[in-house]
């Protein structure tokens, strides 16, 4: 419950965090949906570490790759919209956290791994996906959508 939020300023800060992450997800999803040439294949082919075999298997199966692409595009879009609107807050923050952790596990920022895509800087272990997953965990722990969001209206009879 959000009773753990100490004051209004903290509540608004957490709502802003939720909305900003939602915007990032929504933008990434829509950008992929609008690009007829987008595919997760390049990302998957660059996978290193424990899931590289799974990534190559996904790319080698067109129907599985299409499913993964659609799950990515629509998942990002719907999770982002729900985070912005404060709808199904705890569920979508957990789904979003799991999604970016999958991205992290396929391409972790370990210093001994080299990727074809140029990096955004020199990460040791922590990258933007890990940070966003942790931020979504905070959003999960403090479900602000129960106070500021559609969850307040949709689930008002359950509280």
What are these regions (language model features)?
Residues 1-45, 49-78, 85-159:
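Extended, low-polarity transmembrane helix blocks
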């Amino acid at each position: 419950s959000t009773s753990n939020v100490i004051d209004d300023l903290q509540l608004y800060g957490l709502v802003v965090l939720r909305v900003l992450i939602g915007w990032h997800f929504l933008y990434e999803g829509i950008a992929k949906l609008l690009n007829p040439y987008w595919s997760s294949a390049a990302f998957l082919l660059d996978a290193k570490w424990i899931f590289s075999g799974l990534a190559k298997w996904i790319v080698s199966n067109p129907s599985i790759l299409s499913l993964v692409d659609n799950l990515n595009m629509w998942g990002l879009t719907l999770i982002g919209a729900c985070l912005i609107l404060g709808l199904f807050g705890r569920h979508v923050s957990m789904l979003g956290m799991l999604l970016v952790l999958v991205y992290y596990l396929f391409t972790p920022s370990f210093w001994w791994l080299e990727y074809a895509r140029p990096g955004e800087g020199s990460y040791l272990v922590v990258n933007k996906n890990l940070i966003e997953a942790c931020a979504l965990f905070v959003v999960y722990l403090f479900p602000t959508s129960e106070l500021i969001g559609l969850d307040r209206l949709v689930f008002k009879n359950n509280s």
